[in-house]
């Protein structure tokens, strides 16, 4: 995935962008066959909730049973890295420019929002997945569900 040239995205801001993207993306069942975000967001939220206790349990279990500390630490670090991997992927995806097929659909949804009387900020540069998430979130609130029939 490539990032737009006009934005400087460092490693740590990708986590923040991923968190924002996961909160912005509408988790609608009709989007799941086309976009992988629904699955990634659900699994990332699951990992954020359950992987830290699993990491602590793994360490405590190995220490209590007198096992080796090295494999326990490696397993705990792997468990702790899973939520970070999900947030990093979502952050990277949020700044990825839209492919041509989705770009056309993005402009159609924006057009339908504008036809319904919504005031939208102009798109700066090439739209990315974060712009799509913002537009879809607004479309699900303002429009009826038939705007997805073209997808």
UniProtKB/Swiss-Prot annotation:
GO biological processes: negative regulation of chromosome organization
Transmembrane parts of this sequence: 46-65, 69-91
All ranges on the Cytoplasmic side of the membrane: 1-45, 92-151
InterPro entries registered for this protein in UniProt: UPF0208
Domain of life, per lineage: Bacteria
The keyword Transmembrane belongs to this UniProt entry's keyword annotation: yes
Cellular component annotations (GO), alphabetically ordered: plasma membrane
Sequence ranges on the Periplasmic membrane side: 66-68
Keywords: Cell inner membrane, Cell membrane, Membrane, Transmembrane, Transmembrane helix
Membrane-topology annotation of the record: Multi-pass membrane protein
Subcellular location: Cell inner membrane
Secretion signal, residue range per the UniProt entry: none
HAMAP family with a match to the protein in the record: UPF0208
Family assignment from sequence similarity: Belongs to the UPF0208 family.
Annotated protein name in UniProt: UPF0208 membrane protein YfbV
């Amino acid at each position: 995935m490539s990032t737009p040239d006009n934005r400087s995205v460092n490693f740590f801001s990708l986590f923040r962008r991923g968190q924002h993207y996961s909160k912005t993306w509408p988790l609608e069942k009709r989007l799941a066959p086309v976009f992988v975000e629904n699955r990634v967001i659900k699994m990332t939220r699951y990992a954020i909730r359950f992987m830290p206790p699993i990491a602590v349990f793994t360490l405590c279990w190995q220490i209590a049973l007198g096992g080796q500390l090295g494999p326990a630490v490696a397993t705990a670090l792997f468990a702790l890295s899973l939520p970070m991997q999900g947030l990093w992927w979502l952050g990277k995806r949020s700044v990825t420019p839209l492919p041509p097929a989705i770009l056309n659909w993005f402009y159609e949804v924006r057009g339908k929002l504008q036809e319904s009387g919504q005031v939208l900020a102009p798109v700066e540069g090439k739209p990315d997945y974060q712009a799509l998430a913002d537009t879809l979130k607004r479309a699900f609130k303002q429009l009826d569900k038939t705007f997805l029939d073209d997808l």
